[in-house]
Amino acid sequence: MPELRSRTVTHGRNMAGARALMRASGVPGADIGRKPIIAVANSFTEFVPGHTHLQPVGRIVSEAITAAGGIAREFNTIAVDDGIAMGHGGMLYSLPSRDLIADSVEYMVEAHCADALICISNCDKITPGMLMAALRLNIPTVFVSGGPMESGRATLVDGTVRTLDLVDAISDAVNDKISDEDILRIEENACPTCGSCSGMFTANSMNCLTEAIGLSLPGNGSVLATHTARKGLYEDAARTVVDITRRYYEQDDESVLPRNIATHAAFENAMALDIAMGGSTNTILHLLAAAQEAGVPFGLDEINEVSRRVPCLAKVAPNVAKDRTYYMEDVHRAGGIPALLGELHRAGLLNEDVHSVHSPSLSDWLKTWDVRAGSPSPEAIELWHAAPGCVRSSEAFSQSERWEALDEDAEGGCIRSAEHAYSKDGGLAVLKGNLAVDGCVVKTAGVDESIWTFEGPAVVCESQDEAVDKILRKEITHGDVVVIRYEGPKGGPGMQEMLYPTSFLKGRGLGKTCALITDGRFSGGTSGLSIGHASPEAASGGTIALVQDGDRIRIDIPNRTIDLLVDEAELSRRDQALNGVYAPVNRERKVSAALRAYAAMATSADKGAVRDVSKLG
């Protein structure tokens, strides 16, 4: 039977000082050494709408842990708002913050000998950073996120009512046909509430994937941040972490440990969900990183195999269905992630040998929570009726609206069955070829099928800023392939997101007639023929460093290939001319010591852009 980890600091005369400090921090003396210490990793910050409401959430979770028989000790991590950091030097810090968050959780848990962990995450790098930490620590852990934002609604000058999200505010801002007054109305209404941005962007994608992996409760990825139903989710998560902590330490039940939940089969299921729902390409980066922390051999080849057999069952903003745009509130109304998993299960596309923090098996999980399975629990039906309040609010639990009816239409609704899939090809794909020997990724759910095969001349940019300038100066034309290089994990450093270039292409009317390729990455809000994570990156001598203006590039999504149409002899000549120096030309960029440290250890995107400490020698 494993001893409580906290016994190290709660037992023995020589730990009198540690116990004195615990008493000073509010722990009742009678509880010290008798109850498990549950670390509450909160990520509250006033910088990020996805986290601005989390301060009271930490208290709710801590109080529920106390009531369930644990000792809750809350601390905070940092949280970068990618939307605010976007388009300037601040974005260099976003991806490196993932590893910093993972380290900070590890530091706090190990320094204080916590017995278990509950992670209150939400936005882009916070959930994956905490996931990496949980798998690294391998102590009983439950995830519970802050929840999605409601979609926006703006009444324009001409009386037209538009549904909106953050990406609309960015792309419309460069559309000369939209008036300043309408831009202001769009800006004021695109992000109406607290929560992670309303589409299937990176934050919501990752929170949904924690459900599929088995480390969070049903509804974690889809119950709106503003809804009162989310309070019950926080309390249930708190009770669950105390329960699995007891099962491990009192019953020697190792099945509750993160590495025994997040198995290879669980990662495959999560990737199947990701592809079916057309999640952010960033999720691939983060799942690769998490798998390494879990010791699970899971790479781009496995992801490519899954992508070839799983269809696209949901198109959620920024991906657009033919008749309408769906948001996370629509996914929730359709039964949330259990409904998507249920459709995949009925199509024979999920591994059965998985379990979760809340259910002993996949079949038990879906029987209880899938509203389309025929016998969902009353609690499930109640949960999926939680609807948007359509009132501006930055407060959690500020509304309790309910849908009159659920969307159970598997033929034409938000979530489709495999038989009625949006496309037989899934929403994400891995491409390989001489331009990306180790692979690159594209969100096919966001690409118009008319350009799934594409060939055009390269327009080379040594930075995201150069690409933005060329787009805004109208130097990019229909048929071009914009190549942005030296923006990878090492070359950036920090692997910036490219939401502005893709949004500006869309705003200029080039979203369906141009391609963009980069060794950087894209926001979850990106759509169009946007191919990222080209590996090896330019700074590591990848072929993308050899591309010249006018070179023809061919993209073939159905056949999963991407090629620079330049013969090998010429590429060899160009490589020799660089003389081993792979660096951007005429780019001035301030790089801090913190970023240089990240770059010194960073791996390419095909390895998850994780740090490789062996590079330190």
UniProtKB/Swiss-Prot annotation:
Could you name the active-site residues? S523 (proton acceptor)
Q: Name one GO molecular function term.
A: magnesium ion binding
Cross-referenced InterPro entries, in alphabetical order?
Dihydro-acid_dehy_C, DihydroxyA_deHydtase, DiOHA_6PGluconate_deHydtase_CS, ILV_EDD_C, ILV_EDD_N, IlvD/EDD_N
Enzyme class, top EC level, equals lyase
Q: How is the cofactor bound?
A: Binds 1 [2Fe-2S] cluster per subunit. This cluster acts as a Lewis acid cofactor.
Reactions catalysed, semicolon-separated, are: (2R)-2,3-dihydroxy-3-methylbutanoate = 3-methyl-2-oxobutanoate + H2O; (2R,3R)-2,3-dihydroxy-3-methylpentanoate = (S)-3-methyl-2-oxopentanoate + H2O
Q: Which Pfam families match?
A: ILV_EDD_C, ILVD_EDD_N
The entry's family comment says: Belongs to the IlvD/Edd family.
Its biological purpose is as follows: Functions in the biosynthesis of branched-chain amino acids. Catalyzes the dehydration of (2R,3R)-2,3-dihydroxy-3-methylpentanoate (2,3-dihydroxy-3-methylvalerate) into 2-oxo-3-methylpentanoate (2-oxo-3-methylvalerate) and of (2R)-2,3-dihydroxy-3-methylbutanoate (2,3-dihydroxyisovalerate) into 2-oxo-3-methylbutanoate (2-oxoisovalerate), the penultimate precursor to L-isoleucine and L-valine, respectively.
Protein name, UniProt field: Dihydroxy-acid dehydratase
> Which species expresses this protein natively?
Streptomyces avermitilis (strain ATCC 31267 / DSM 46492 / JCM 5070 / NBRC 14893 / NCIMB 12804 / NRRL 8165 / MA-4680)
